[in-house]
Amino acid sequence: MTRSEELFKEALKVIPGGVNSPVRAFGSVGESPRFIKRAEGAHLYDVDGKEYIDYICSWGPMILGHNHPDILESVVQACQNGLSFGAVTEMEVKMAKLICELVPSIEMVRMVNSGTEAVMSAIRVARGYTGRNKIIKFNGCYHGHSDGLLVKAGSGVMTAGVPDSLGVPKGCTEDTLTANYNDITGVQELFNQYRSDIAAVIVEPVAANMGVVLPKEGFLHGLRKLCNENGTVLIFDEVITGFRLGIDGAQGYYGVTPDLTTYGKIIGAGMPVGAYGGRKEIMEVVAPLGAVYQAGTLSGNPVAMTAGYTQLTILKENPDYYTKLNQMGELLFGDIEMKFRRAGIPFQMNHVGSLGSLFFAKEEVYDYQSAKASDTEQYKAYFKYMLNKGIYLAPAQFEAMFLSVAHGEEEIKQTLDTMDGFLESVR
């Protein structure tokens, strides 16, 4: 028995399912989780001493690679001043100013502790601002585990094959309307029926929690148009895409301006943090300025703010990093496409920039239903082979691959060579 197996056995006794987030259990891929001891650059090292090339990057925030020396140094210095004060600090002001500078749609921003909290707060703000109740979300899009959004969600809920979560009262979801991702006609029909009571449309501009699913041409612009016509708040959930597709995220990449934007772990360089922000007139309804209440003891935590400020500053000062990320993405994802096509295995490789997903599917993947048509048993075999050869991929078909600045041609070559071995094994 490996040390990871021993630890998992112990964890099962004291933690539900042995993990603190379901996807980590490796249940959908028929493996036991690897317990990670440390990380450096593009590599993870488990408690048994095995090394992996990491394509999860802590689910996105380690865009500069693990254990970046500048971030590490800034965090150590911040810790020496104290871990939490429950009071205002200069660093949270600097962080807010930087986000407003980098993202033109954000005029004011409020820090919270996670992407889930950011989304939950943004929806409350949209309802308070509009005086309306209903929201539209998209099937397969995951916006955290708040009650009102666990309706036809993605990520772990999708992997588990559970459309909703037990413990969520009907009353919590009766104002949540759902449409198919990339179906602007379906959204129009919801507006036709409920237009006077739709407070917000919330969307992952690139869906990344049913695997990576790209917006079709005109979809995001269509949402913007419908929201404008109906006085509805457009919320972009950029927990995954924010500061990854570019310094101004998916909204800059696709040229669509939301009213509110939510962020998660990337603005803390992997530390627990989130934020929501947008137009000043909307954000001014938040307490203590307005009557929409939202608070948190650890919101704006000085250590998390320091880590995030350092990471965003590095990205701001090195725009060529995005060029490299895109080049590495084209190299990796493009060669994956070529290899699978030559092997004659049904697949779809959806990708944008440094974000991608390999679906074992025969037809184009463009929404929840087409994603669900993927062969999860084939993905399981693929995952196991790659993991045992030192390539750490998402332990579920319906999650994304992430690249970091630390991934270089050597890591890409090793990954592609390993993939050759997998393809040879299934011929």
UniProtKB/Swiss-Prot annotation:
Its EC number is 5.4.3.8. Pfam families: Aminotran_3. It comes from the Bacteria. The keyword Translocase does not apply. The modification N6-(pyridoxal phosphate)lysine is found at residue 265. Its cofactor is pyridoxal 5'-phosphate. This is Glutamate-1-semialdehyde 2,1-aminomutase 1. It comes from Lachnoclostridium phytofermentans (strain ATCC 700394 / DSM 18823 / ISDg).
